[in-house]
A protein has these predicted regions:
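Single-stranded nucleic acid-binding surfaces, predominantly the OB-fold ssDNA-binding core
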Residues: 1-108
Length: 108
């Protein structure tokens, strides 16, 4: 495990649930885009936020939003339906903030 910040677009609205004795947890995925040798690549990062911050995220984040999420990264192995193995990147977030798209400028 290690700490990281990832910026990407929300793939869907957050999914809120309550566990144990009412602890709020919100889950969502963001698409992180980057260029490598003139090839546009996308990696989906699964995020979870717990506690009061989860409630705030559920109220303020929406599908399509550009968001920066910071927290602890883990890799969860799983097996696809075709039997091949892969890993899902998961980020247990300790913070988030909405971002403004880069490259946009206001014309005077």
């Amino acid at each position: 495990m290690f700490n990281a910040s990832v910026t990407g677009r929300m793939g869907s609205d957050p999914e809120m649930r309550y566990i144990n004795e009412g602890t709020p947890v919100v889950n969502f995925s963001i698409a992180h885009n980057w260029l490598y040798r003139d090839e546009k690549l996308v990696k989906w990062v699964r995020c979870s936020i717990w506690g009061e911050l989860a409630e705030k995220a559920n109220e303020t984040l929406h599908k399509g939003d550009l968001v920066k999420v910071s927290g602890t990264v883990t890799f969860r192995p799983w097996t696809r339906q075709d039997g091949t193995s892969t890993e899902e990147v998961e980020l247990r977030a300790s913070g988030f903030e909405k971002e403004e798209p880069s490259g946009l400028a206001e014309i005077p």
